[in-house]
Structure formats: C-alpha cells, structure tokens
C-alpha cells in the first residue's frame, strides 16, 4: 500500500510536468502518461461469464459519474451494467430541462424532455418499448413517487438519478433486485476531461467530445427553406442524442422526444432506414426532424428521409457531394442546417 500511495503521488507529478513545455505553456497531452486507478470491487464476471472482471475507479474524479455514485439498493452491478449506466448518464447530462434517457447495449433506445419527469420517462420508454425492457434508465432530476411507481411496473436493470424522494425509495424497494444508483449533483464541469480507449498494446488518448449545445451557436442554412423555431429545438434534441449513439447514427425526433433511432450501421442510408423502421410500430416518423452524426456522402439518405416524412435535418456538412444533398433537400421542401462538427462514436 505504501508503494501504491507513493507511485500515485509520483504519477501526478509526472503527468503535470509532462504537459508543461519549455516555455511553461501547457500541452494537453503529455509525452509519457501514467494512470492510477484503485479497485472498487470485483465483479461477478466480465462482459461474459467466462471472463473475470473488476471495477477500478479514479479517486480524484470530481465529475458526476457512475464511478462516484452510491448504490442505494439492488443486486451487485455487472460490467455491462456499469458500461451501459455510464453511457446513459453521459447522455442525460446533455440536457438542462427535465429529461429521461433509456439505454440498451450501450445505445440510447429512447430519450425525451418534458416538464413532467414522469411524462419524460413514458415518452422515452414508448419510443421503443421492446428495447426499453431490461434497459438502463437515467434521469437528470429528482425521482419522485409518481416516477417510481411507473418504474416498478416493468423490468429495468439499473436506475440512475441525482436524488430520490423518501417515498420514491420506499416504492422502489418493491423491486429488490433493481439496482438504484444516486449520482453526485449533475453540474457543468470545469475539468479538462479526457477520453481513453484501449487497443491491443496501447491506448488512444483524446479530448472528451464537446457538449452539443456549442454546435448550435453558429450554423449555416444551405437550403431554400429555413427551419422554424420548433424545428430548431427538435433538431437540437436529436443532435444531443445522436452524439451518444454508435456510428453511423441517425436520430428522428418530434415533440421533445425521439421517435426512431438508427444505430451502428455500416452505411448511413441503412441507419436512416433503421430509424424509420424503429418508428413504425410506435410514434411514426411523419413530421419528424433528423440528426446525422456525420455528413451524408450521397443524396440517398435524404431521399429515404423524405419517404419517412422528415421535415428538417441537422448534419455537419462537408461532403464533396454537399450540393447534391442540398438539392435533394430542396426538392422535398426540407430545411437543413450545417453545424460543421462531427460526432462519430465507436
């Protein structure tokens, strides 16, 4: 333990000095990187039962996270629970108004904003109720008894929120296996957060992706029709969700909720088609707004969106065929905005 404490201290000094240049200016990424994590607990198993697993945490993390959350009840968390709960929490952090996010296998399957947190949950769940079953649910505000009553009416694996009323906690006890996590207060961080991904023999180290609100500070409208204020609001919601969906990502939204999510397809037009398929049995895609995490390389994605009843699109822009894509949008009286920022997620 003594060596461990000393090594952590030395690592902190090394990392700090590593980002200082000769002129004392700072470079975000050091030449040598030393990471220090402490084992929180062993897991029943890893991603699959034949794999061993443990959860290691950064004790210095101040950002609200699954790592510094408190488990109020339920079975022990699995590796997949932690991974999905992290994705769910990071997505719900994107929203300032009351919001609910439901995640299944590391992809959002339903997201909604509403003045009523209960209605936000119902709207998110009903986007794709089949996928929501057995999923992870996160809220960005206090869970009261009405929400708790709705939660225990179905099966979910993990519930995440910054706080719970005493009545809600009592109601949730009706599902003793439900893992209930309370996070620290969700507030904007001033930390310089970094993102780490592992590959065999190394790690990839980068800035954490930016918040989605910043992308809408400046945007261009290349189409003949400009989006309405309502469309802009809906496009922003879709964009926030799209940033947290595995690429290629397409999100359809309407009335402050997602209506169809096309995740993880190997080409963009299939993601558009999948989002439409997902919407068919529930909310439908008519009069929806579409977000795409990267540019459309061809007009086929726009043509498919038109068939789905999409009225407005947000995308980064920047394709060599942008003019072709803009023409397709104009032919279908769609409004389209270019934000100039891509949000790939792998």
Named regions from a protein language model:
Residues 9-13, 19-346:
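ATP-dependent carboxylate/acyl-activation modules
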